């Protein structure tokens, strides 16, 4: 008698399928977690030149494998279904620290899928320079290159940096870079943020600056740049932040600056700029912070600055301004801080300042102002030590406020009670502590949408 072979039931087939599927998935994960040998060898060499962990190669033979990833390294699966390094971060916790003998690894520019590099406080003991390998990979995918606070990173910015055509964020701040800014940088049409601040760069700002049509943030502050502000700056229509402070720039602010309609922050302090402001400066309707202390301007204060409705901070100290304080400044309803100290301003203080709801800092000291201080006791108490009118011999205080004010830098009208120092208001409550950290407010409020716009890493810094 022939026995018929029993067919597996549908339920047993389903069980078998569910049993073997995870095995295939695990095999798929193992494949996707592997890295091309040449790329893994490059990564090992980078880690050996940078990391203080000398056992890194043995401890992480496959750094992209699930469960084996290391802080500071991110991997992505490429179109070849293999894993590739997409991000390298060194120097700031929880990322790996750098060893004292670390030197700049030029081989990072040979990683074909690398999108972001961040080296913070890595090169601190031995001099090193930004180097490029002889042979570069075509069509580099690098979008962010940030080298910050590296006191031993010196030398010139290499023109070959212009080969990184996908670069959107270039931050080389707080290093010891020297020489001219290479014009080749301004061929990087994808750049949205360029920060070369706090170096020792010299020479002029290249005219090619105007090629960066997508630029949103530009910071060249704290260098030794000379020459004039290039007129091509007017072509940066998307610019939101401009910081050229603490250089040796001279001449006038170019007329074309009025075309920067998206500008929120402009700092030009500590230069040699002089002459009249552009008449069209009132077109900067998005401007919130204008910092321009310590320039030999020697002109009257521009009335047009009073027509900037979003202006929150205006600093024009120590610049030789003369004439009266424009009445238009009392119409700046969003103004929180105004400093016109150490100029040659004359006339009376406009009375409208006390009606500005957000003002908490007002410095008109060391001028030639005259007349009765036009502020009532409530305004004096509100500003407290954030109000400085000292050094104006022609000013006097209303006698009605004599008993609410102590240690004043302004005489009471008709009396001689000057005791020197700034204006200080008596109050039974504890005096509020002054805070002048205005720029942080700008980055938190004005540049947060900009950070979202970039769509890259949240680590980059304006």
From Swiss-Prot:
Signal peptide position in this chain? Answer: 1-26
Q: Which residues point to the Extracellular side? A: 27-441
The cellular location(s) given in this protein's UniProt record come to: Cell membrane
UniProt entry keywords in alphabetical sequence = Cell membrane, Glycoprotein, Leucine-rich repeat, Membrane, Receptor, Repeat, Signal, Transmembrane, Transmembrane helix
- This chain's protein is named Receptor like protein 29
Pfam families registered for this protein in UniProt? LRR_1, LRR_8
Cite the source lineage. Answer: Eukaryota, Viridiplantae, Streptophyta, Embryophyta, Tracheophyta
How is the protein disposed in the membrane? Single-pass type I membrane protein
The regions listed as transmembrane in this protein's record are 442-462
**Similarity comment:** Belongs to the RLP family.
Instruction: Enumerate the PANTHER family for this protein.
Output: OS01G0750400 PROTEIN, RECEPTOR-LIKE PROTEIN KINASE 2
Keyword Cell wall biogenesis/degradation in record: no
Which residues carry attached sugars according to the database record? 139, 334, 363, 416
**CC terms in the record's Gene Ontology section:** plasma membrane
Query: What residue spans do the LRR repeats cover?
Result: 139-164, 165-188, 190-212, 213-236, 238-260, 261-284, 286-308, 309-331, 332-355, 357-381
* Gene3D superfamilies associated with the record: Ribonuclease Inhibitor
